[in-house]
Amino acid sequence: MPGSAGRTGEGRRPGGHRRELHPRRRAPRPADRAEPFAALLAQLIGTAPAVTAVPSLAPSPPWTGWDHSGSGLWPDRDDEGHDLNEVTGPAWVDEAARLVRQQMRRCDAPDKIGHGDWESQNIEWQNGEPLAVHDWDSVIAQPEVAIVGLAAAVWPAAGGPGEAASIAQTEDFLSAYQATAGATWTTGQIRLAWTAGLWVRLLNAKKDAARGGGPQLDLLGVEIEQRVARAGLHTGDWLSRGSGLAR
């Protein structure tokens, strides 16, 4: 990581495989508040090199890949090697993903470099200060609102099934990031952040659906109406008919 925001705990072997540079230590993390996680991400984005100064970071990992170049709705392969385009339904998940891609593609903000897997399980702390950040094969180049929105949707996840940010935790992260970065986002920017964050939650829900169900699908079924509303997506009546099936 650039600057003093922490150090990487992983490296690359030839061929792109990761290796541990030191045993991962489970240092106590800050109290479950968004501010430290948002501030660390703001420091990373603010000190990262320009996108033009590094080799291409495309394609984005599937869970961040609303910007993928495949011909289907979903990336050609998810992070487990499966083609989610071959999985039928749920219809509300597919329709929401379509709307997310449609809205995000209209975002013309410049790309920045950030971390695309900003979950608490990938960040170590010591005495309330960042000690190490892991999973550097998840670095992405996307608009700032997208990077932050993706993080805001998942930051509390510590590796357990079904873990993700609640609606309130997502709101707290977005507010904390703006405060740390000294920015006041427009309504449109905030909606784009919610939209990008919805992508990772939808992909996780779709993966659960491929397995016949699971906690990510169940959780998003409860939250979907609030998340699409905050994203400003126009859903028609498919949402009220479809999401209830996931509850």
Question: Locations of the language-model features?
Answer:
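N-terminal membrane-targeting/anchoring modules of bacterial envelope and secretion proteins
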Residues: 1-2, 22, 62
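Conserved structural core of kinase catalytic domains
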Residues: 5-36
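A cross-family kinase active-site recognition segment
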Residues: 27-88, 109-111
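ATP/Mg2+ or Mg2+-diphosphate-binding catalytic cores
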Residues: 73, 175, 202-247
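Mechanochemical coupling/switch segment within NTP-driven translocation systems
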Residues: 90-100
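Active-site acidic catalytic loop and adjacent metal/ATP-binding pocket
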Residues: 101-146, 158
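Active-site activation/catalytic loop segments of kinase-like enzymes and analogous catalytic loops
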Residues: 145-182, 196-215
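All-alpha amphipathic helical-bundle segments outside canonical DNA-binding/catalytic cores
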Residues: 184-196
